[in-house]
Amino acid sequence: MSKQKIRIRLKAFDYKLIDQSAAEIVDTAKRTGAIVKGPVPLPTRMKRFDILRSPHVNKTSRDQLEIRTHQRLMDIVDPTDKTVDALMKLDLPAGVDVEIKLQ
């Protein structure tokens, strides 16, 4: 018999928010009797941009900006109905993107 598994992937620009959200999800799942594997930190993606400081001349003078996207991965093995209900009612911060897959 195959076990059901919920895979949760979190993405955010702020690592503090994503760690706080991951801790809330783990606490909620453990309270309802599910087994949690993770959170596993995935590689941080850095996107860099070069922007000209001057609108007219001085091509060599540029600003460098970057956006870092932090990611975490969690697996909830054998979730109960209580676990699914508790995860649906969970209120996470606005800056965290959550992807949930049933496997």
Curated annotation (Swiss-Prot):
Question: Which keywords does this chain's UniProt record carry?
Answer: Ribonucleoprotein, Ribosomal protein
Domain of life of the source: Bacteria
Keyword flag Plastid? no
- Provide any one GO MF term from the record: tRNA binding
Q: Which cysteines are joined by disulfide bonds?
A: none
Pfam families hit by this protein? Ribosomal_S10 (PF00338)
GO annotations of cellular component type: ribonucleoprotein complex; ribosome
GO BP annotations listed: translation
Q: Which SMART domains match?
A: Ribosomal_S10
Similarity annotation: Belongs to the universal ribosomal protein uS10 family.
- Function statement: Involved in the binding of tRNA to the ribosomes.
Its assembly, as annotated, is:
Part of the 30S ribosomal subunit.
Known NCBIfam families for this protein? PRK00596.1 (NF001861), rpsJ_bact (TIGR01049)
**Per its UniProt record, what PANTHER family does this chain match?**
30S RIBOSOMAL PROTEIN S10 FAMILY MEMBER (PTHR11700)
The protein in question is named Small ribosomal subunit protein uS10
Naturally occurring in which organism (per UniProt): Verminephrobacter eiseniae (strain EF01-2)
Gene name per UniProt: rpsJ
